[in-house]
């Protein structure tokens, strides 16, 4: 019984993580556009970021915190600003 419950918890956790990563991707897209970059590939190219990888971040791929901080600095966005209202999406 414990094994079955732990499997359900794992699925719930993975689903929750997926939702948060999608939200992070949506926020990255929002702030990129707010910074004046209509195209994600152009933003990545201009800032020496792998274009395919940046596209994956906006699509909801897992992103390391240090990478997120670096990208936000390029957009002149603080972590506080980035996560303000995060749960309202």
Regions found by a protein language model. Give the residues of each.
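Alpha-helical residues within helix-turn-helix
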Residues: 30, 41-42, 70
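Short amphipathic recognition helices of helix-turn-helix/homeodomain-type DNA-binding modules
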Residues: 83-89
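Short alpha-helical DNA-recognition segment
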Residues: 36-56
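DNA major-groove recognition helix of helix-turn-helix/homeodomain DNA-binding modules
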Residues: 66-81
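Alpha-helical residues within the helix-turn-helix
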Residues: 33, 45, 73
